[in-house]
A protein has these predicted regions:
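Generic structural concept
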Residues: 353, 357, 390, 394, ...
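A broadly conserved sequence feature marking short terminus-proximal activation segments
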Residues: 73-129
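Short, charge-patterned binding micro-sites
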Residues: 52-58
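Basic, alpha-helical terminal appendages of large translation-related enzymes
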Residues: 1-7, 51, 68, 123-128, ...
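A charged helix-plus-loop insertion that forms the helical arch/lid used to bind
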Residues: 62-75
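Short functional micro-motifs and their immediate structural scaffolds
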Residues: 138, 155-156
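Structured secondary-structure scaffolds
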Residues: 2-50, 97, 102-106, 156-369, ...
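Long, amphipathic alpha-helical stalk/connector segments used for oligomerization, subunit docking
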Residues: 332-335, 339-343, 348, 363-387, ...
């Protein structure tokens, strides 16, 4: 398969619609959307896939309890997901439901292909089964006799099943790990897979079930339904038209450049998924990024603990961009992120209001005060303080690119906020009010130009994360065609000519009353 450059294909996991999506699901999706927007900004042909994983015993049970057929239930949940992603301005290109014919028919073809190749065989499965996780475990994998992933009770089950011969490909997989260091990020996840699953002896994977019927039937043995992971993982291919009459998208976008998954489904994506692709003789994704969870101070989110927060709650009260910013800023690479009402309000007040909004407001006000809103042009001969700011901005932009290209999202945002802080410091260093008083007009012009220019750079940097805020900043500093902004515009320092800031600067973010908002968030988390 010919691999095209200058394209970017990013996927989220397809989400299991067993209930309302909380901020953990929102984080994954916002992250994918941010990376898509960044690569679009760089002029790349970018494509994002998301969707819902709709088969299995758990869905069948939930649908029955709610008095609906499984299909009615999953369609309702998919509609809710699309509504949420619209509210969060997620620019996905395709939303796949695994109950769609374009998926189910191809999964059956893939199963038959594996059978013909001798990758799948029939046997009998006995193991400890976790219904919520839809996963079998050996006795040694259990933790205190319970599911190692979710901590719930497991059942000993025995049934006829088809198995995928994982052992056949395991050496090839480990070799691939070693030869492709960018395949798994962060890198420590590779060692987890090897030490926890591969070295102890990788079990063959059960890929069908007979104890329920809500799933894709095996064509040549219809009492079997194809089990969740062979069904779910292949959505990344079926959505592009793999094994269909039209595989244009597959030729254009596969292999995926970035696949984002939570740590709870890491082994399925880092072991089973690449092995399936090897068996199909398809190229593997360039990078699979495994992120941690968003936790509460008292552990995982749970309705019984009264600590669940939904993205709609944050968006309706504080706006979309602060919600996106908080989710992306609070998730470190190597550990779980923590959500607390106090942390959310603090980020809003300090980062967005004090640092960013005040910088925009002060700068626009000064250009209006000293130059009637007309932005002076670049003089080409920066003084020492100006040059230090220019060099610092260039350095921070390069570091930002390095961090974002390595998917260190929170660290990339830190580089932007370092630049915001340095630009605020530049105002204190240059003291424009003193320059005006002393009638040092050329120095004052250079200072105003550098402030506006840095705001332009900051707006471009935050555009993938907070598009509306970026466009607001650009509009306030006199750049109207925000849709024409491209990443390559970010480095030059002499791009602004004949522009005028708006007459009265508008605060982008207004300071929150800490006690009031903390109490509000605590109250809605208990509902």
């Amino acid at each position: 398969m010919k691999i095209l450059n200058n394209k970017f294909y990013v996927t989220t996991p397809i989400y299991y619609p067993s209930g309302k999506f909380h901020i953990g699901t929102a984080y994954t999706t916002v992250l994918a959307d941010t990376m898509k927007r960044y690569h679009q900004l760089k002029g790349e042909d970018s494509y994002m896939l998301t969707g819902t994983d709709e088969h299995g015993q758990k869905i069948q049970g939930i649908a029955e309890k709610s008095g609906k057929t499984p299909k009615e239930y999953v369609d309702e949940m998919a509609a809710q997901a699309k509504e949420l992603w619209a509210k969060m301005e997620i620019h996905y290109d395709d939303f796949i439901q695994t109950t769609e014919e374009r998926h189910t028919k191809v999964v059956q073809k893939i199963f038959d292909k594996f059978m013909e190749q001798g990758d799948i065989y029939k046997g009998e499965y006995e193991g400890w089964y976790c219904v919520p996780c839809e996963t079998y475990f050996t006795e040694t994998q259990l933790v205190d006799g319970k599911c190692p992933d979710c901590g719930r009770e497991v059942k000993l089950m025995k049934e006829e099943a088809y198995f995928f011969n994982m052992k056949k490909y395991v050496d090839k997989l480990v070799k691939y790990y070693d030869e492709h260091p960018d395949f798994i990020k962060p890198a420590f996840r590779k060692n987890e897979m090897i030490n926890n699953f591969i070295k102890p002896g990788l079990e063959d994977l059960c890929v069908t079930r007979t104890s329920f019927d809500w799933g894709i039937k095996v064509l040549k043995d219809p009492k079997h339904v194809i089990y969740v992971w062979l069904d779910a993982l292949t959505n990344y291919l079926t959505a592009l038209g793999y094994m269909s009459d039209d595989d244009t998208l597959l030729k254009k976008y596969w292999p995926a450049d970035l696949q984002i998954v939570g740590k709870d489904i890491a082994r399925f994506h880092l072991i089973y998924w690449p092995i399936f692709l090897m068996a199909l003789d398809l190229p593997l994704p360039k990078t699979i990024l495994v992120h941690n969870w968003i936790m509460m101070k008292d552990g995982k989110m749970s309705k019984s603990k009264g600590n669940v927060i939904y993205p709609e709650t944050l968006i309706d009260r504080y706006g979309l961009d602060p919600t996106r910013y908080f989710l992306l800023r609070e998730m470190p690479v190597n550990q779980d992120g923590i959500f607390s009402p106090e942390a959310f309000v603090e980020r809003y007040n300090f980062d967005l209001c004090n640092d960013l909004s005040n910088l925009v407001n002060r700068t626009v006000s000064m250009v209006n005060k000293y130059f009637e809103g007309n932005v002076p042009e670049y003089n080409g001969t920066p003084n020492v303080v100006d040059k230090e700011l220019e060099d610092y901005a260039t350095e921070k932009i390069k570091k930002f690119e390095e961090k974002l290209n390595d998917y260190e999202i929170a660290n990339a945002l830190q580089e932007i906020w370092d630049l915001i802080a340095r630009t605020n410091k530049y105002i204190d260093e240059t003291m424009p009010w003193s320059l005006a008083k002393e009638e040092k007009i050329e120095e004052l012009k250079s200072t105003m130009y550098h402030l506006i220019e840095n705001l332009r750079k900051i707006a471009i940097l935050i555009k993938p994360f907070m598009t509306d805020t970026a466009n607001n900043i650009l509009r306030q500093i006199g750049i109207v065609d925000t849709d024409k902004i491209r990443w390559n515009d970010i480095y030059p320092y002499d791009t602004l000519k004949d522009i005028k800031v708006i007459e009265k600067g508008e605060p982008i973010f207004m300071r929150l009353k800490v006690d009031e908002e903390v109490e509000y968030l605590k109250s809605v988390m208990k509902k």
